[in-house]
Amino acid sequence: MEKEKEKRYQRVDEIQSALLAMASVTPTAGIAAAKVPDTKKILEAAWKKSIAVLPFSNLSPEKEQEYFCDGLSEEIINALSHIGELRVAARTSAFAFKGKDIDIREVGEKLNVGAVLEGSVRKSGQRLRITAQLVNVEDGYHLWSGQFDREMKDIFDIQEEISLTIVDHLKLKLLKSEKERILKRATENHEAYDCYLKGRYFWNRRYEKGFQRGLQYFQQAIEKDPGYALAHLGIADTFGYLGNFSFLPSHQAWSRAEAASKKALEIDPELAEASATLGWIAMWYDWDWTAAEGHYLKAIQTKPEYDTAHLWYGLYLSIVGRFDESIQEMQKARELAPLEPVNPTLVGWALYVARRFDEAIGELRKVIESDPQFAIAYWYLAASCLAKKMWGEGIVTIQKFVELSGESVIAVSNLGYAYASAGMRDEALKILERLDRLSKDRYVGSLWRAAVYLGLGEKNEALENLGKAYLERESILACIKVWPAFDSLRSEPRFKALLKKMNLD
């Protein structure tokens, strides 16, 4: 293999594509067929250089140590993802097996990996006992197993030992820069690290109270180590989602998200996740489409296996109307994280805004079949049904979204739009009253009122509320160029002017 990084294949799928192309070429006269590479053997070798890191089991006396077990697995995933020769299953896909009694070979088959790392943690005070096993998916035998009886202060040494042992047993060749990245510690403060793990644990629950608790822990981590880039990124991601899900007014949320992202990149310029978050901010708050694309492409270039960067870039492409590219990019995210429900869900969104409603419905029904609790899939499925005037299914589906989301503003507003679109005017007006009541103890964006008025056919009220949403800089307004629900406004001068102000004309 080439020693110079720029001449090497950077990902396993690039190797596969090249080999398949070579295999399709018939040897020319005078060239021995024996010189054509044995594609099957080389593809098998590439498959063996792939791994899933399952969440470590919690054997601690205190069951609240779950956050530490999840965090340890996630940190090992992050370390291994810096190795260009190794394909690492995304966290969300690996964590789909959490708490399930499933054969390792089945895990390997579902995630298309050649090896699986599993383990357990027993934590008592400052004492740790960590066990780890590296299993060959092909035959189920252990390639390696180890036990670490250490103090909490040694956690970073343990992570490095496990990561480098995997490199050794999978016979991977590390570039100097890759090894440096594995050994580079985000913090030397184990108390800050512990706070960060707690923050991510609650953040990953993806609901308002979880975001708020996560934010507290990220802030504690920074108090203990101001130079902890990942903790700054945690704050950025938290405020980004609080703004995006309308839990906070945009002006409050996004400026804090941007400041924290820039701080994270200042500390660690190679942090792909921070670049992606800056793209997220440029897209949802700044409405700076050129900057957003640049940030996403930088994140993908820095970390090609980062499925979220591909997903967010695909979402960006759908918002600006580049539908075919959007679906293609989201499919890349799905390939990298096949068990993450948000990936096929946003494929469904992209099909919906591309007016491919039947395909969207098929895609989203499959998501719900595999994960009936994944709330956002019900929103996009309902929207696709309503676009086809399937009023009954649309209303029932959005009612399920309201239930699963805990009566979120987004869900309640969409129920009002569904009632109005189906001609159920009285029910839609009651939803407007319900939004007024909700606004007494939570933020209710003007766009969500506009959606109900739009369903009622009251264009003037809808446009007035869209104007307020622009002044409030509500993030979801970024979608109006392509959102089918707003098609009835496209000939309106005020709507055209709004698109122009957002650089979406």
Report the location of each language-model feature.
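Acidic, proline/glycine-rich low-complexity intrinsically disordered segments
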Residues: 39-411, 415, 419, 424, ...
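Short, ordered coil/turn segments that flank beta-strands lining enzyme active or ligand-binding pockets
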Residues: 5, 137-139, 197, 455, ...
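Terminal, low-structured helical/coil segments at or just beyond the last alpha-helical repeat
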Residues: 480-505
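Amphipathic alpha-helical protein-interaction segments enriched in hydrophobic
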Residues: 409-414, 443-454, 478
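TPR/TPR-like (Sel1-like) alpha-helical repeat modules
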Residues: 467-474, 503
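C-terminal lobe helix-coil module of Hanks-type protein kinase domains
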Residues: 1-27
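Post-kinase regulatory C-tail/linker adjacent to protein kinase catalytic domains
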Residues: 29-42
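Residue-level recognition of oxygen-bearing side chains
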Residues: 14, 325, 359, 461, ...
